[in-house]
Amino acid sequence: MTNIRKNHPLLKIVNQSFIDLPTPTSISAWWNFGSLLGICLAMQILTGLFLAMHYTSDTMTAFSSVTHICRDVNYGWLIRYLHANGASLFFMCLYLHIGRGLYYGSYTFLETWNIGIILLFTVMATAFMGYVLPWGQMSFWGATVITNLLSAIPYIGTDLVEWIWGGFSVDKATLTRFFAFHFILPFIITALVVVHLLFLHETGSNNPTGISSNMDTIPFHPYYTIKDILGLILMILLLMTLVLFYPDLLGDPDNYTPANPLNTPPHIKPEWYFLFAYAILRSIPNKLGGVLALVCSILVLAIIPLLHTAKQRSLMFRPISQCLFWLLAANLMILTWIGGQPVEHPFIIIGQVASISYFTIILVLMPIAGLIENKLMKW
């Protein structure tokens, strides 16, 4: 059996990636989120496939087909809520995974980090298009507002928006193409995940100290497969609690009203995992400026490796940078809260202050803290 595992052309790749992979001995539970994300992706593809068997991407029947799935299909309600809440868990794991990368300096693996940023954009696009499919009020108006942002692009903006819509408003053509893209993108994400892992295994995993651990590694299986199963059990526990007890906790009640182009909801807002970016978008009174800030709020991750001024890789032994990191985490929570609030005083000013501090911490304070810590260490 060992020989087949190590010599078979296909099994050899699996073996080198998941079984005999040399893994640092010191990695903590924060390294669990990669495997959890893989499981989330597999679950989303599987539940999505079963939903697609019963869903119809037509403006007249989309809302009814989702109702039909919940009422008439065997365990359709379970599949639907697993898919909807699975997306929330996916983003929880994703943000914690990125946070881990920032904290422990994993962004110095440039290829892995950049593929990760592309993955983040792709997952966000997929989630946004998935939110449009039930064709409720928030689906319709969310699609209208977010796609309309592209009209801020000079010269080609309006043409681009109408091209994406497939007409002069969000309608049947938009829903059909969003369904097509929502179906195909997870498979593109899977391909990108393989590339992400390929680049990661070129360098090997980082560890909490940020120091090379080539001389101190153990096989991934059985040590980390067992360790990852604990994280998996906790994630399933959280997911099933959400699905079976509070299935609509993270959703929007407006989405239980069929889409009506003649009636605008009082507060148009995306799902909770986009609220931080939505708050940054809304904090700038100019349309183009807001769109640029929205894109930069994610794209800023790409220049973080260039802003790494410290001689140490990880934040483990850097107290000033640690304080800034947790300040950034708190700031993101404030932005998430503001994104769900109406555009009125005092929320406007809180959002603007939080947006400015978000970029200031990343672009200015973190690099300065790195230089100060170098001085303190007399490096």
Curated annotation (Swiss-Prot):
Cofactor: binding details: Binds 2 heme b groups non-covalently.
GO cellular component, one term: mitochondrial inner membrane
Principal subcellular localization: mitochondrion
Miscellaneous notes: Heme 1 (or BL or b562) is low-potential and absorbs at about 562 nm, and heme 2 (or BH or b566) is high-potential and absorbs at about 566 nm.
Residues annotated as binding a ubiquinone: H201
Protein name per the record: Cytochrome b
Cofactor: heme b
Listed CDD domains: cytochrome_b_C, Cytochrome_b_N
Family assignment from sequence similarity: Belongs to the cytochrome b family.
Any one GO molecular-function label of the UniProt entry: ubiquinol-cytochrome-c reductase activity
Residues binding heme b b566: H97, H196
Binding positions for heme b b562 per the UniProt entry: H83, H182
Name of one Pfam family that matches: Cytochrome_B
